[in-house]
Amino acid sequence: MAKRDYFCFVVLFLSSVSAVIDDPQNKQVYVVYMGSLPSLLEYTPLSHHMSILQEVTGDSSVEGRLVRSYKRSFNGFAARLTESERIRVAEMEGVVSVFPNINYKLQTTASWDFLGLKEGKNTKRNLAIESDTIIGFIDSGIWPESESFSDKGFGPPPKKWKGVCSGGKNFTCNNKLIGARDYTSEGTRDLQGHGTHTASTAAGNAVADASFFGIGNGTARGGVPASRIAAYKVCSEKDCTAASLLSAFDDAIADGVDLISISLASEFPQKYYKDAIAIGAFHANVKGILTVNSAGNSGSFPSTTASVAPWILSVAASNTNRGFFTKVVLGNGKTLVGRSVNSFDLKGKKYPLVYGDNFNESLVQGKILVSKFPTSSKVAVGSILIDDYQHYALLSSKPFSLLPPDDFDSLVSYINSTRSPQGTFLKTEAFFNQTAPTVASFSSRGPNFIAVDLLKPDISAPGVEILAAYSPLGSPSEEESDKRRVKYSVMSGTSMSCPHVAGVAAYIRTFHPKWSPSVIQSAIMTTAWPMKPNRPGFASTEFAYGAGHVDQIAAINPGLVYELDKADHIAFLCGLNYTSKTLHLIAGEAVTCSGNTLPRNLNYPSMSAKIDGYNSSFTVTFKRTVTNLGTPNSTYKSKIVLNHGAKLVKVSPSVLSFKRVNEKQSFTVTFSGNLNLNLPTSANLIWSDGTHNVRSVIVVYTT
């Protein structure tokens, strides 16, 4: 009887599923990716997209089906399709992939001083080219009236600029903010603050006396304040869709931006041909445009980063030497030090403390709520929580502090020791963090889930407690109850580290405007400050910070670089078993995969390999080629630094001699060591001519 009931259920279930699939009213938005634009003069993308829809729907009127048409920089469209229509489109000639219109998420000044790019005459700049540099920000829009985007002292936009200012009602561009496009129907004005913050972090003007209610007071500025900004709004207050992202890439590439900064990430890693950011960034790379992308805020577990393509510079978040703390003063006079950005000054007035996890609102009204778990109250004066994981300052709409476990236990002991426990908050102060830089707990980690032999993220940069411009329409704590409005705010996330590296890339480009995206990426990675794990565990190693912490001063003059072009990336995809037919569409030209390409031999600045096995020895080989961008008649000697589990690294040849600039030399690295499930085996290869130290991270792991 049970089996019969189960069988009936399955039949009914499958019947209902079939009915849903075939229901013409059940349409969803899908992205149809068709690769590069055909070079045929008579080809019109929009007409082709419409004809595809007409064919699969059997209807000549399909205007209501088409959502987006990608026709300026690559080929494809977004449309409302039923499941059966999706299947038919996916099977059509000329289609690379069809994937759901998934949602991407926002990955939500002293930081530049920490990086060595100080304000003033001592910082080397090439202002003429910096002013000719255009950074495209794909984000939540921008607040054009911010002082960070004033065009005082700016000349007209560069002649290469082909974009427009279509920001919507009461939105005006200028000679600093030269372009604006909206894909949300809200207008390009930033309603959240995120896009304003990221744009000003990379390219904002120097604004004196910027602070968050007096906290972090100083000069807020971007890494390249003389550069131009183009804002592409893809994030509404509701979502950031794949279809909108691809439209922004399509326009930004054709508009003539020099760099793209995108502080967004999908919830999970996607295959490259189904990832809007990977698709857009690939076509940007082909046009000589580097895409810098946040690694994600999914925390310190392995394989959480979704920014995993080799043609993207993926950025983890780390802290700086400035942090914020908030003191809690108890009724017995003891002071405890926690983390938060608390702008509220209680003037020393003490309030009753109540400890627990679940309370009726009437029990906490007018009191300070103390809890081990995240909680909120509309009527409590403020809250104190335990910080056993975050290790960075959060904002709240009320007085708030995160106490380290020992101090939290001390607070609970005090509460239990008296009938009338009391306490108060002091306003947040800044402190000097001697342990910086360390990777933030929220920053997403590798290993790379899509291409296991490619190390991601690539680099780490400041992303903790960053002060930058903000939208007056946004809540600084992102809480609806927070009615404060500010021009500058403090935010943390890989969303903040991404524009730091975009600013660094733009800074490098001002000295080397003809450098390709891969050369700039290599220069940033091979000159990074070495970092070490700040906590035990597999995901706290190179999988947390990649090559290390960005050093833009050294990156201007890297010595040797690892170059990549379109053909290298296509060969890499061959090694991932993409078919020649698919790659022909992506590349826009004939592709023949040789069948013996190993992804680990992509000429990437880092080296990584996943090996099957456990507690066993291994030997793996990497092949690389470097280009001399230093001085002619130079000789580089190899040096190896062995880390955990590494036994031996052989480099052949161990010495590279160059007679001229732009000369290339190839070498092989043979790495031997022991596999360990708990830690990757790693080493550093350093090529040095006595002036330049070109460092590559080598990581071998098993899972």
UniProtKB/Swiss-Prot annotation:
Location of the active site: D139, H194, S495
Enzyme Commission number: 3.4.21.-
Location, primary (coarse class): secreted
GO biological process entries: proteolysis
Enzyme class of the recorded protein, top EC level: hydrolase
Stored Gene3D superfamilies: 2.60.40.2310, 3.50.30.30, Peptidase S8 propeptide/proteinase inhibitor I9, Peptidase S8/S53 domain
Domain PA residues, every copy: 350-411
Domain annotation Inhibitor I9: ranges: 29-106
Record flagged with keyword Signal: yes
Propeptide, residue positions: 20-107
Keyword NADP: no
GO molecular function, one term: serine-type endopeptidase activity
Peptidase S8 domain: residues covered: 111-556
Any one GO CC term of the record: extracellular region
Pfam families assigned: fn3_6, Inhibitor_I9, Peptidase_S8
Residues of the signal peptide: 1-19
Keywords annotated in UniProt: Autocatalytic cleavage, Glycoprotein, Hydrolase, Protease, Secreted, Serine protease, Signal, Zymogen
Entry-linked SUPFAM superfamilies: Subtilisin-like
Family: Belongs to the peptidase S8 family.
Protein name: Subtilisin-like protease SBT4.7
